[in-house]
Design a protein with these regions (language model features):
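Generic N-terminal amphipathic, Lys/Arg-enriched alpha-helix
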Residues: 1-18
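Flexible, glycine/charged-enriched surface loops at secondary-structure junctions
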Residues: 21-26, 40, 207-216
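Long, charge-rich low-complexity segments
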Residues: 237-242
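Internal, active-site/partner-interface "lid" segment
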Residues: 171-175, 204-229
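A short, well-structured juxtamembrane/interface segment
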Residues: 18-35
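Ligand-binding pocket scaffold of soluble enzyme catalytic domains
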Residues: 11, 39, 53-54, 179-182, ...
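Glycine-rich phosphate-binding loops that contact phosphosugars or nucleotide phosphates
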Residues: 35, 41-200
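A short N-terminal beta->alpha junction/helix N-cap motif
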Residues: 13-21, 39-43, 122
Length: 242
């Protein structure tokens, strides 16, 4: 059996129990946002940008979702430069401005360490606009490193709702002994699991109330394009990335 798989399954199970109340709070905020005609923004910097990709324009995902990201913050475009750019608060504020975050929206910001200027600024800028901010980060990692944001705040400090992934310090799950780098990161898996738990909760509440959950269908399945036209008509005027 795989050590990574065993430990990942343990972390997922622990997260679901330990963070149940915080996840429920995030679900409640997202439901209120959808009911008021607002948007659910999600993203981060570096590999946490995967949250933007997973949540946005995704078969089975929310049509009310809007991505928070930036080319300068995404490693595939310029890896070494992105490491420096994610430390810059200006980049974080610019990402929120591009997304068009508004009062009443719910904003999910992911960051393994929660120390860099851009994600912390994303949270602060969103809160200034009246949005509810949900931080997805690792307390284990954050506790061992100093914030790089000018305020001295970690991402957790700038959020209304905090969800701790439980990912290990340094992200890598498997140790190899003294003098060797640990390997097999797990933060992306845990972050996407958090998003999926929130998505599940949102749809269940809307369904139970007899309301329509705005969900995309696969464009690679019969009828998908036709279904999605309805979602586009409703959300393209507001979601800038559409």
């Amino acid at each position: 059996m795989s050590r990574w798989l065993d430990r990942s399954q343990e972390l997922l199970a622990e997260l679901a129990v330990r963070e149940a109340a915080s996840i429920a709070a995030a679900v409640a905020s997202a439901v209120a946002t959808i009911r008021s005609g607002g948007l659910i923004h999600a993203g981060g910097t570096g590999h946490s940008t995967l949250l933007a990709l997973e949540s946005f324009y995704r078969a089975g995902g929310l049509a009310a979702a809007s991505p928070i990201w930036g080319i300068d913050l995404f490693p595939p475009f310029a890896a070494r430069a992105s490491t420096q750019e994610e430390r810059d608060p200006v980049q974080g504020r610019a990402a929120i401005e591009r997304a068009g975050v508004r009062d009443g929206d719910t904003v999910f910001i992911a960051s393994q360490s929660g120390i860099n200027g851009a994600p912390v600024e994303m949270a602060l800028a969103s809160a200034e606009r009246g949005a509810t901010v949900v931080a997805i980060s690792s307390r284990l990692h954050a506790a061992k490193v100093k914030s790089r944001h000018t305020s001295g705040k970690h991402l957790f400090d700038a959020a209304s709702i905090v969800i701790d992934t439980g990912a290990p310090y340094g992200d890598a799950l498997l140790e190899r002994g003294e003098g060797k780098a640990a390997y097999a990161p797990v933060s992306s898996l845990l972050t996407i699991a958090v998003w999926s738990l929130v998505l599940e909760g949102v749809v269940e509440i809307l369904d139970a109330a007899g309301e329509t959950a705005p969900i995309w269908k696969s464009s690679n399945a019969p009828g998908g394009d036709e279904w999605n036209e309805g979602m586009l008509a409703a959300y393209a005027p507001r979601v800038r990335a559409l």
